[in-house]
């Protein structure tokens, strides 16, 4: 009788260890997915939340009914003209994205402007990043020149930021710290 109970307990322990191993394996898989953004706005919100009070500046984000003060906001991807005018996203390529968010310096957008775009076609992010770079570098600037342009990817998201060197460097450092999959494609002077 004792042998049967001992075998039953051993079987229960073996099964419980096996199920714990599967749960831990699943947690690891979902942990990897956890590091991937759910949408464009999430990327900017996470990065902005890492700014200290001293690092933050007067900001605005989003477009139209999604406009936010002192925080990032969702940008309407159906408004190709606004994407181009405000963020430097080429209007001819607006159909290639299905989600966008923005964060801009409230007083002078040339100090800091950032757009995050979800690319519809997986694998097309780098090609689209090149078109964004060309469009921004071809602009005619008023009220001073931004110092630099940085374009990065986070999975299927393209992140474009231009402005003062200190502000763009702070943003890119915080983005890279938040998302390990961040890949810098361009870091070029504008002025």
Q: Residue spans of the language-model regions?
A:
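Positively charged n-region of N-terminal signal peptides that target proteins for export
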Residues: 1-4, 8
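Repetitive helical segments and hydrophobic/amphipathic motifs
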Residues: 11-12
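C-terminal motif of bacterial Sec signal peptides marking the signal peptidase cleavage site
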Residues: 15-19
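Soluble, non-membrane globular domain cores that form compact, hydrophobic packing
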Residues: 21-113, 119-191
């Amino acid at each position: 009788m004792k042998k049967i109970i001992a075998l039953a307990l051993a079987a229960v322990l073996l099964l419980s260890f096996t199920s714990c191993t599967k749960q831990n394996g699943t947690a690891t898989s979902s942990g990897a997915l956890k590091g991937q953004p759910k949408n464009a706005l999430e990327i900017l919100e996470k990065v902005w939340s890492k700014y200290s009070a001293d690092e933050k500046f007067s900001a605005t984000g989003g477009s139209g009914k999604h406009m936010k003060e002192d925080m990032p906001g969702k940008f309407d991807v159906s408004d190709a003209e606004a994407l181009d005018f405000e963020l430097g996203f080429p209007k001819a390529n607006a159909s290639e994205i299905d989600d966008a968010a923005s964060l801009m310096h409230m007083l002078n957008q040339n100090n800091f402007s950032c757009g995050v775009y979800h690319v519809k076609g997986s694998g097309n992010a780098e090609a689209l990043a090149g078109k964004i770079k060309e469009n921004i570098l071809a602009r005619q600037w008023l009220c001073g020149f931004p110092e630099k342009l940085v374009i990065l990817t986070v999975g299927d998201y393209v992140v474009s930021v231009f402005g003062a060197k200190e502000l763009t460097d702070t943003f890119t450092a915080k983005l890279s710290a938040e998302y390990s999959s961040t890949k810098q494609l361009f870091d070029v002077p504008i002025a």
